[in-house]
Amino acid sequence: MKINIRDSTMVRPATETPITNLWNSNVDLVIPRFHTPSVYFYRPTGASNFFDPQVMKEALSKALVPFYPMAGRLKRDDDGRIEIDCNGAGVLFVVADTPSVIDDFGDFAPTLNLRQLIPEVDHSAGIHSFPLLVLQVTFFKCGGASLGVGMQHHAADGFSGLHFINTWSDMARGLDLTIPPFIDRTLLRARDPPQPAFHHVEYQPAPSMKIPLDPSKSGPENTTVSIFKLTRDQLVALKAKSKEDGNTVSYSSYEMLAGHVWRSVGKARGLPNDQETKLYIATDGRSRLRPQLPPGYFGNVIFTATPLAVAGDLLSKPTWYAAGQIHDFLVRMDDNYLRSALDYLEMQPDLSALVRGAHTYKCPNLGITSWVRLPIYDADFGWGRPIFMGPGGIPYEGLSFVLPSPTNDGSLSVAIALQSEHMKLFEKFLFEI
């Protein structure tokens, strides 16, 4: 796909903002170190000012005033801990066009083509050199447009990131800020002294393959990214399987879907019966902490539920067995457990050793992040809601996302990166409901 860059600007806050250093909590520091990629697609409206860059940039500049850390840079404090230097240096805003059309993207699988709609970040000059937010509006030959977003994960998780993007889109429509961001991460400070009360398996090393994989088939060049849509009827049928074999515990649709994906991936990978597999479920702590965090808390509140099973149990038992493992872990994630996790992290000599990455999710393990409850379709800049929003790439084999339907038809989509030889089998098993 050919992309022609028309303009590239650093957009700064519209008025003076606090010059300060923002302390990062332990959960800000153990999430993957990359710019989370996402892409929005918009159909043409016929408006003469459709996605006018000037309108977009002025609103962006206004939104950066309350959300001033987004215009900062990363730096290390005297102890080497990463924090945010709120210096108002700005965010990158790129305008581009392409002879391609939106329909060229088909089902919007987060492939390398989609990644071209987001500005590349050069990390080579050190952590203080790059913006925390990079944005690109791309105009298509069909008249439509996309908004590509790369957001440094230390700055925000999905919930906070969307709070910013949706505030920006509101301001582009002339609306005022509704929920101010709460910019103080010390609410997630560990206790002094730390008092971890649980064995935090989520921060223990992931199981590795007992029989090593063929390196010629397991490298990044042999990883495929696909997206699969499950209809409302298929999801209802899947949830009904929680009652198989006389099981009396009711599991949620999400627990059943996550369990089904975990099993299907295990089958597709052909895991031996005695192979351990760990599932990493991103879990938002906002509603689980007591007292609850302020609604505009700006940062990362992502904890991880990590059920562990042997493949033989996972594959030979009904889907509700996998869902049950997931359910039991999610139920545990209350205030006591999350505070214990913060304390456990505080006691680690080097948090960088716990940063998630390719080594975490690769075969035999799996990561699932749900965007189902996130307001991913609310970014209306004045020209309508997006027809699609999803990840702009999946950086690691074994990482997956569950996405809601843009049309509220009750369907869900699973975007996933797997070894190419496993993907076809995964598709087959996923639709065997």
Swiss-Prot record:
Question: From which domain of life does this come?
Answer: Eukaryota
Active site, UniProt feature = 153, 380
Q: From the Swiss-Prot or TrEMBL record, what is one GO molecular function term?
A: shikimate O-hydroxycinnamoyltransferase activity
What does the record give as EC number? 2.3.1.133
* Keywords on record: Acyltransferase, Cell wall biogenesis/degradation, Transferase
Q: Name one GO cellular component term.
A: cytoplasm
Biological role stated in the UniProt entry: Acyltransferase involved in the biosynthesis of lignin. Accepts caffeoyl-CoA and p-coumaroyl-CoA as substrates and transfers the acyl group on both shikimate and quinate acceptors.
* Family (UniProt): Belongs to the plant acyltransferase family.
What PANTHER family does the record point to?
SHIKIMATE O-HYDROXYCINNAMOYLTRANSFERASE, TRICHOTHECENE 3-O-ACETYLTRANSFERASE
Q: What is this protein called?
A: Shikimate O-hydroxycinnamoyltransferase
Supply the source organism for this entry: Arabidopsis thaliana (Mouse-ear cress)
